[in-house]
Each structure stands twice: as C-alpha cells, then as structure tokens.
Design a protein with these regions (language model features):
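Conserved phosphate- and dinucleotide-binding cores of soluble alpha/beta proteins
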Residues: 9-10, 22, 34
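Conformational coupling and interaction surfaces
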Residues: 18-21, 25, 37-204
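Class I SAM-dependent methyltransferase SAM-binding "motif I" and its flanking Rossmann-like core
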Residues: 1-15
Length: 204
C-alpha cells in the first residue's frame, strides 16, 4: 500500500502510511529492489468508502446466499462496525471506513480499475514518508503507482459485490468470535500504539 507525499493537495500527508511506517527499512529495500511493484497509495483508497448502501447490499446478499463468502465478508465488516462504534460512538462508521486493503488487492488483480503511472519512488527512513523523486538512484525504485480510480466508486463497489457473490469456498464454518477493542484514531484502552497518518481524516 503506502502513500505518496501530497499526491492529493487537498489531503496533506505529514506522516508515513502505517504499513511502511512500521518497517521503513524493509519498505525501502523492497521498493528499491527492482522487483516489479504496483503501489496503491492510501490517498487513492479513500475513494472506495464503505457506504451505508454498500453495507446494506452486502447484508441482503448474505441473507439470500446463506453460508458463503458473502456472509463471511458481511460478518467481518459487521464485527468491525460494532467494535468501532463501541470505541467511537461519536463517529459515524460510514464516514471514516474505507476498503483500503481490499481495493489494493482488486488493483493487483484488475489494474484497469485504477489510473496507473510509472514513478520513481523513495522511502525516507527518518519519517517513513513515501515520496516521488525526479529520477533513478541508490535507494530509489521505479514503481507503478495507482494515481486515481479509473471507474466510478459505486461501479467498483458493485463489481466487488458480484465478485464476492461468485465465490463458493468449501466447508465454510461460522463461529462466534470476539473482536478485540481497536481504534483508528490514536491509542485505545489496551495500549495499542497510535497509528501513523493521523492527519489523514477520514479514512486512515
């Protein structure tokens, strides 16, 4: 995933995206390795929001399809929603929750849903920032970067619903699980470290 410093001038990024911030040295090595990479910045995933309409459509599909991948996806998002609302009752879940990783996976499988450009990218070991630079050099990678979505967000979400509905994993078992307390906005009561990119609201 990652993010590009000031990819969107309306959303200033002063901190590194969490996945890169957590291990900047490894991120720098991977990006500069020469391995073919496609980066889907956090800035771009903000377009793919878990809307109330998407949530309700997923709920309806789960009810009609029984114990399938649809119900698994719905139960996962439902559990996240319940846990989030317990920790942050003052915040509307649908205002701040995005399909960060699912959209990155979608781009990996179907890159045509994103507007992709080739960029020279480096990772700053001190700040964790992922930045575009003017040319190649030591510690710099030549990376394909998703700069924006290539289709309307509702169309992408509908396509995701269709893809999930088409999956029929064998022997799926649904068991009650307890989602531990978590937060998107700083440390929770359990002492989880504060995540990076706190200035990026909503959708960190």
């Amino acid at each position: 995933m990652g993010n590009i410093q000031d990819l969107d001038p309306h959303i200033p990024n002063k901190l590194g995206e969490w996945n890169i911030f957590a291990d900047t040295a490894a991120a720098k090595d991977v990006i500069a390795s020469g391995v073919p990479l496609t980066m889907v910045p956090l800035d771009v995933t903000k377009h793919i929001q878990v809307t109330e309409q998407f949530y309700n459509e997923l709920s309806d599909l789960a009810e009609r399809n029984g114990k399938t991948a649809v119900s698994l996806a719905y139960n996962l998002i439902k559990a996240l929603k319940i846990a989030f609302e317990k920790e942050h009752p003052e915040i509307n879940f649908f205002d701040v929750y995005y399909l960060w990783d699912p959209f990155a996976a979608m781009v990996a499988l179907e890159p045509q849903i994103a507007k992709i450009e080739e960029k020279y990218i480096k990772v700053d070991l001190q700040t964790g920032k992922t930045e575009e630079v003017s040319g190649s050099g030591e510690g710099i990678g030549h990376v394909r970067v998703a700069m924006d979505i290539a289709k309307p967000a509702p169309e992408i979400l509908h396509h995701l619903l269709e893809a999930i509905a088409s999956l029929t994993p064998p022997d799926m078992k649904h068991e009650a699980v307890t989602v531990p307390p978590f937060t998107l906005f700083g440390s929770n009561k359990g002492g989880t470290p504060e995540l990076a990119n706190r200035d990026f609201k909503p959708g960190i």
